[in-house]
Amino acid sequence: AAMRYTETRLAPIAHKGFLEEIGSETVNFSNNFDGSQKEPDVLPAQLPFLLLNGSSGIAVGMATNIPPHNLGEIVDGLVALVKNKDISDKKLSNIIKGPDFPTGGELIYSRAIEELYQTGKGSITIRGVVNTEEVNLGKGKHKKNAIIITELPYQINKAGWIEKLAELVNSGKIIGISDIRDESDRDGMRIVIELKKDSNSELVISNLYKKTTLQTNFGAIFLALIEGKPVQLNLKKYLNYFLEFREETIRKRTFYFLKNTLDKLEISEGLSKATKNIKKVI
């Protein structure tokens, strides 16, 4: 074995949320792989980053696939749980309405999201954001109806999706499309799908959902390690475990500060006595 390292770019909130309390004896440290250094068993996270960032992993006989969530909704959910520990799953899911995927897309709300939050397992349907408009083809040319896609579902590669769509159009599996252009720029994504003269835009959009990954399912499972053991958690249990962890972390941090303060007090008392009896000390 040899030293390995992983670099990651953290936002300021992540650096503060992960590492601010690391030096206050808030978490246990263990030997690294060769015993040359100590490393934290866990990080003293101030936010439930497993839910915020999401996570995906696979092992023998198990897997986890946690979608990312909105920071504001998660914090509101934690506050509601602190105020009422007996809050129902339904009320909690009214606060945390669903995953928040960074690449956008639209969630098709259904019983599946409630099932995910109540059981810790479920399948979420995601669609790209689609609009129709008339596009100008140039000076002296007629305008043409087009489908405009401004967001794709989570983890769908734009270039790969356009290439696959072109293959389906060329093979005749999707009809009614005359041209596909990528007009994306710094302001955001814009995929223009020009329609043939007599095409039905609603029918074309329906085929895009059915035959491409413009609509996908995200199979989620909230599997996490609790005291080193994999456990499937529903949303409320996960948030409760996080609150318990924060209580423990804050308690350890407080004892650390108390210990340091008492040590300083002992030194101050010693200096005070020495000052009062300076001749004897000398």
Feature roles, as predicted:
Residues A1, D100, K144-A146, P153-Y154, ...:
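Long, charged, helix-rich clamp/arm modules that form nucleic acid-engaging surfaces
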Residues A1-T125, R190-V192:
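Catalytic phosphate-handling regions of large nucleic-acid enzymes and associated NTPases
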Residues A11-I22, D34, P48-L52, V79-K83, ...:
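Signal for well-folded cores of large energy- and translation-related assemblies
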Residues A14, L43-L51, I124-E133, L165-I177:
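Structured alpha-helical segments in the cores of large, soluble enzyme domains
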Residues I66-H69, I156, G160, S199:
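A generic structural signal for alpha-helix starts
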Residues I74, W161-K164, V204-I205:
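Hydrophobic side chains in well-ordered alpha-helices
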Residues I96, A112-E114, N170, A220, ...:
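N-terminal non-catalytic structural scaffold regions of very large proteins
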Residues N131, V135, K139-I180:
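Long hydrophobic segments that form regular secondary structure
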